[in-house]
């Protein structure tokens, strides 16, 4: 299982939001490239970037910060936020992003996701952010009437690299990741799932690791890494292990 340290960008700085509220932002580093270098030096093999301003405005906003990160590290980077057309996808991939995350357009223009996947195989993930089980878009400002699983199932045969699932009500609140909802989603899909939202302790990582065989391929971790609740080496050792304390992980039926 891969752990993805999160670098959320707002006004050029590395921040964490509380439940997706832009007014509830805590600045952790004013130099995102330095934060990226730190994560790489700690042994992380991927980085997860989000252009928060871009998610709200529907276009890239923190481009300079993203480019500074791409120039500072050698590990692959996945990026979401404000990516809503093929031109923007191509631009970021040309600049060195390894995988783009499509969120709002996955709900509003699912065919664009399929077209992007065909044009950029292995480079496109779908971000599904849910509030009480229903998909939220436009930087979480709007909640739809579509359930997360129903949207995910639309892309089962499209060949997207992963589904990134976030429980908005828990995100940034340190209340513990929603393991049940994440594993249930993964169980019903063949597409790998990456868990996100409120990972607050090693216990959360253990709980997710035990459900790895349902299809949970990775986990995004933010605030808990920044404030020291999760030790990088401990987390990396845990998630690279075959099982947790000898406890077999559960498997998919059939």
From Swiss-Prot:
Keyword Oxidoreductase assigned: no
SUPFAM superfamilies from the UniProt entry: Ribulose-phoshate binding barrel
Coiled-coil residue spans: none
Active site (record annotation): 8, 129
UniProt pathway annotation: Amino-acid biosynthesis; L-histidine biosynthesis; L-histidine from 5-phospho-alpha-D-ribose 1-diphosphate: step 4/9
CDD domains: HisA
Any single GO BP term: L-tryptophan biosynthetic process
GO cellular component: a single term: cytoplasm
Matching InterPro entries: Aldolase_TIM, His_biosynth, HisA_bact_arch, Isoase_HisA-like, Isoase_HisA-like_bact, RibuloseP-bd_barrel
Any GO molecular function: 1-(5-phosphoribosyl)-5-[(5-phosphoribosylamino)methylideneamino]imidazole-4-carboxamide isomerase activity
Catalyzed reaction equations: 1-(5-phospho-beta-D-ribosyl)-5-[(5-phospho-beta-D-ribosylamino)methylideneamino]imidazole-4-carboxamide = 5-[(5-phospho-1-deoxy-D-ribulos-1-ylimino)methylamino]-1-(5-phospho-beta-D-ribosyl)imidazole-4-carboxamide
Lineage top rank: taxon: Bacteria
Localization of this protein: Cytoplasm
EC number: 5.3.1.16
Keyword terms of this UniProt record: Amino-acid biosynthesis, Cytoplasm, Histidine biosynthesis, Isomerase
Keyword Signal applies: no
Family per similarity comment: Belongs to the HisA/HisF family.
Name this polypeptide is given: 1-(5-phosphoribosyl)-5-[(5-phosphoribosylamino)methylideneamino] imidazole-4-carboxamide isomerase
